[in-house]
Amino acid sequence: MELKHFAQVLQDFNPQNGRMEQFHIGNTDVILNLAKNPAGFNQNISAVMEDKREKDLIIVINDNAQDGTDISWLWDVDFDRFAAPSIRSITVSGIRCQDMRLRMKYVDIESELIADVQTAIRKRIADGCGNLYVLVNYTALFSTRNILANMH
């Protein structure tokens, strides 16, 4: 491949697909990111907290076979870092939203439970959030991405 074509390929390359993937829906900038274990989730938390703007969060946790049905790893994640003035709201969603809400309660962080992911996203956008982070585990990634792409 000639160098001029290679530069164009690099410019057009989009490695996202759920890795800090960005959507713009109405007046809301949405970032979708995969978090499937404690190390990955803690990296997500660091990325979210580096953004000093006000933001809302949706955390989607499933326990399908591909995710692994043992979600005890959630207790190894440093969710207490979300106790910051820049976090306007946290919504928990997905099959294991009750467990995620309990986990947030243990670090004294209030969260709203909306089991249906699409409803959760629509509600946050309707509430006027300007910046929305959607953190999902593996089996929630593709369906959530489709929801966001269809709203985009």
What is each of the regions a protein language model found here?
Residues 2, 53-54, 86, 128-130:
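Short loop/turn motifs at secondary-structure junctions
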Residues 98-106, 110-152:
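Generic C-terminus detector
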Residues 16, 28, 34-113, 151:
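Active-site beta-alpha connecting loops in nucleotide-dependent enzymes
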Residues 3, 38, 117-118:
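Residues at or immediately preceding the N-termini of alpha-helices
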Residues 1-31, 35:
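Gly/charged, well-structured mid-domain segments that form the phosphate/adenylate-handling core
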